[in-house]
Amino acid sequence: MEKGRIIRSLSGYYDIETDKGKIQRTRARGEFRKSGQKPIVGDFVDFESENDDGLIWKIYPRINALVRPPIANIDIAVIVTALKEPNFAANLLDRQLVALEAAHVKPVIYFSKADLLTDEAYAAITIIAEDYRQIGYTVLLPASNNNVVARQALQSLLDGRVSVFMGQTGAGKSTLLNQLSPKLGLETGIVSKALSRGKHTTRQVTLIKVNDALIADTPGFSSYEVFDFSAEALDDYFPEFVAVRDGCRFRGCLHLNEPACAVKEAVSLGAIPESRYNSYKAFYELIKSQKPKYKTDNRNF
């Protein structure tokens, strides 16, 4: 029996890499399907080799996991956020941050396409970047004329860790990965001018070795499209709200219409950016309007 990490999943096959660098193609035992378990990229597993194909016998408990894309045991998630083509959208970035907070994955914000901004627009985004740093997030904003320093800082964050890249389609995920390691030869997405959206270029979830890092480039990242928690739990995923909410007069304050709300006071004083509070209110209403999810009961009657 050997232990390794799943680095690729495709059509029912799982490629596993061991600590010694051996790569073994495997399938999962039927018992996993019967118990509702399914191996995903990033899983640590026990497996046996049988001729060309191996068999997965055990999946170790996960530290964290995402559903869309299916990947587990992530150290950091790099949110590649375009500043132009497509234009920067604070609401989208906040939605991605909330999804990662809920999944217990550490976010890193990387602003792309800074070279397309005017001097005035770049100055404005510098202030926004600092707002996110004050919340506690790691933010990388490349210089307006090149991104070499920001790329080097990103590489140092990636080394020795498992990372996933996410962001709006066309934000430049594959372009950034190619810059980090040109030998990858990942196909770069072409932005559709008619739709102002990028064409998907990555077709499978794969962990790729880049220097001392394992990086996942994924076929569409949509874990942030649906909130799988209650509206009452939303403030748990806004770190700056968590930092001050004990000062609210009422326990369970929703930070909307309640008097003596420490969060609203922090917003009025400028300690919490108004854009973040607006995102919170929008997400709260969105969650409230979502249809309840019902889990399927698989018992036989």
From Swiss-Prot:
GO molecular function, one term: GTP binding
Gene Ontology biological-process annotations: ribosomal small subunit biogenesis
Residues in CP-type G domain copies: 63-224
Cofactor(s) the record lists: Zn(2+)
Manner of cofactor binding, per the entry note: Binds 1 zinc ion per subunit.
Pfam families: RsgA_GTPase (PF03193), RsgA_N (PF16745)
EC numbers: 3.6.1.-
Keywords, ordered alphabetically: Cytoplasm, GTP-binding, Hydrolase, Metal-binding, Nucleotide-binding, Ribosome biogenesis, RNA-binding, rRNA-binding, Zinc
Compartments in which it is found: Cytoplasm
Subunit structure: Monomer. Associates with 30S ribosomal subunit, binds 16S rRNA.
Membership in a protein family: Belongs to the TRAFAC class YlqF/YawG GTPase family. RsgA subfamily.
Record's function text: One of several proteins that assist in the late maturation steps of the functional core of the 30S ribosomal subunit. Helps release RbfA from mature subunits. May play a role in the assembly of ribosomal proteins into the subunit. Circularly permuted GTPase that catalyzes slow GTP hydrolysis, GTPase activity is stimulated by the 30S ribosomal subunit.
Protein name as catalogued: Small ribosomal subunit biogenesis GTPase RsgA
